[in-house]
């Protein structure tokens, strides 16, 4: 729904109240991937024709990106689980700080705006406080493509160099396989003049989804999902209809929750090979995994400790490190969790220890000795994935837990507690109302339950 004028709404301080030691049973519907949907929304800026995105998740991050596009002049219509995007009336090439603050994915817009209009101004990105995520690779790549870039007072100002009206193809070798840089440079190169080669590119499924959609729009992108991606620039891109891939992180979170509670569930739809690193570790820890078509079933009893080390795809995803750490707290034996992607992604460790876990942290490595159970507590999640980990810990624990900081959780999990409740977990969202004024794009709720959650 597009809100055309200011209206009164409610900003709610919320918590999840969890009665622990429950079990999960049933089927979980997995939503569209947040990390894919965000970059697909940004890529709609590359065309003057309508884009229809299917399987868009209902998340606060998606709303933020919708508001950014609306501010640029894009018309958005949400209907029947589809989002229609009409970018024909884009009139602004600058993103305001108040809209992009807290949404790192907003920076993806710079590549699309620069290559389409010849210039762009985008504030430095925000997002979860999980450590330094520099944009050097984005900037260096855009400069190599022919942009002049300066950063003034937190604003990245980019303009095509000289009197040219197009970026030019080039060879770019990334120092590390950055997902954001790969996506930004793919979008920028899609309308550049000539061929661009991106070496040491990220291989994540969300990048493959972006390339698939851009090719539907008329782009010429080859070898997405490989370490070297080739883009032959085209003069213009058209419209298309595209279905967002399933969210592998949401899927993995539910599989881990089932393993942690000795439960049996089925998740669908998923793309099983996107989850191979996760299902392999769950099998190693004692769970039985069955794959049939686009569904994965898990049966879990006793869990034993296993070691994981996060890595770029196809390795173990950093976004599931915190939930898997929660699982290992009650595993038999010892385990070691090594975080290699972000230097500040262990914020959940001291909170799990408060619940009775036995974890020693040495910089980016957590050494865990499994305990029989955890104890319910009131805790505040500090970022998206640590919040999910605390909810899993609350389900494991004896007694009642109240998990706060749901503004982080709602950035990445659609209707999380209602799905858990449907699976048999005793969990309730509690509200504390206060009013504010808003004028924002909102994706319509997909069920009566979500409507009730948002009702004033």
From Swiss-Prot:
The protein's name in its UniProt record: UDP-N-acetylglucosamine 1-carboxyvinyltransferase
SUPFAM superfamilies in the record: EPT/RTPC-like (SSF55205)
Gene Ontology CC annotation, any one: cytoplasm
Sequence positions bearing 2-(S-cysteinyl)pyruvic acid O-phosphothioketal: 128
Lineage, broadest ranks: Bacteria, Bacillati, Cyanobacteriota, Cyanophyceae, Synechococcales
Protein function: Cell wall formation. Adds enolpyruvyl to UDP-N-acetylglucosamine.
Localization, UniProt: Cytoplasm
Residue positions of the active site: 128
EC nos: 2.5.1.7
UniProt GO molecular function: UDP-N-acetylglucosamine 1-carboxyvinyltransferase activity
GO biological process: cell division; cell wall organization; peptidoglycan biosynthetic process; regulation of cell shape; UDP-N-acetylgalactosamine biosynthetic process
Organism expressing this protein natively: Prochlorococcus marinus (strain MIT 9312)
Gene3D superfamilies cross-referenced by the UniProt entry: Enolpyruvate transferase domain
């Amino acid at each position: 729904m597009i809100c055309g004028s200011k209206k009164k709404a409610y900003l709610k301080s919320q918590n999840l109240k969890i009665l622990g030691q429950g079990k999960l049973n049933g089927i979980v519907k997995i939503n569209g991937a947040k990390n894919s949907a965000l970059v697909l929304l940004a890529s709609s800026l590359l065309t003057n024709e309508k884009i229809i995105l299917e399987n868009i998740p209902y998340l606060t991050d998606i709303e933020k990106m919708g508001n950014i596009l609306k501010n640029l002049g894009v018309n958005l219509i949400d209907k029947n689980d589809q989002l229609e995007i009409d970018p024909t009336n884009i009139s602004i090439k600058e993103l305001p700080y108040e809209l992009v603050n807290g949404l790192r994915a907003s920076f993806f817009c710079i590549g699309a705006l620069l290559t389409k209009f010849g210039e762009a101004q985008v504030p430095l990105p925000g997002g979860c406080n999980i450590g330094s995520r520099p944009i050097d690779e984005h900037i260096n790549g855009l400069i190599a493509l022919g942009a002049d870039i300066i950063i003034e007072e937190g604003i990245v100002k980019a303009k095509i160099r000289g009197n040219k009206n197009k970026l030019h193809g080039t060879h770019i070798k990334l120092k590390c396989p950055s997902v954001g840089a790969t996506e930004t440079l793919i979008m920028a190169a899609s309308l550049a003049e000539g061929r661009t080669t991106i070496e040491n590119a990220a291989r994540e499924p969300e990048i493959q989804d972006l390339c698939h959609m851009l090719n539907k729009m008329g782009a010429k992108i080859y070898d997405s999902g490989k370490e070297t991606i080739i883009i032959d620039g085209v003069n213009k891109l058209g419209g298309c209809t595209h279905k967002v891939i399933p969210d592998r992180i949401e899927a993995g979170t539910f599989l881990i929750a089932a393993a942690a509670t000795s439960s049996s569930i089925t998740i669908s739809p998923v793309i099983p090979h996107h989850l191979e690193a996760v299902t392999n570790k769950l099998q190693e820890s004692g769970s039985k995994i069955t794959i049939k078509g686009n569904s994965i079933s898990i049966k879990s009893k006793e869990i034993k400790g296993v070691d994981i080390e996060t890595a770029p795809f196809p390795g173990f995803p950093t976004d599931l490190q915190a939930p898997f750490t929660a699982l290992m707290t009650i595993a038999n034996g010892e385990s070691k969790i090594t975080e290699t992607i972000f230097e500040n992604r262990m914020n959940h460790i001291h909170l799990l220890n408060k619940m009775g876990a036995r974890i020693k942290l040495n910089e980016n490595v957590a050494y865990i000795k499994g305990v029989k159970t955890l104890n319910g507590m009131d805790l505040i999640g500090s970022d998206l994935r640590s919040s999910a980990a605390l909810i899993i810990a609350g389900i494991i624990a004896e007694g009642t837990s109240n998990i706060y900081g749901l503004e982080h959780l709602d950035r990445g999990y659609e209707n999380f507690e209602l799905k858990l409740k449907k699976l048999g977990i005793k969990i309730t969202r509690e509200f504390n109302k206060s009013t504010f004024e808003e004028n924002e794009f909102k994706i319509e709720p997909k069920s009566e339950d979500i409507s009730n959650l948002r009702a004033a």
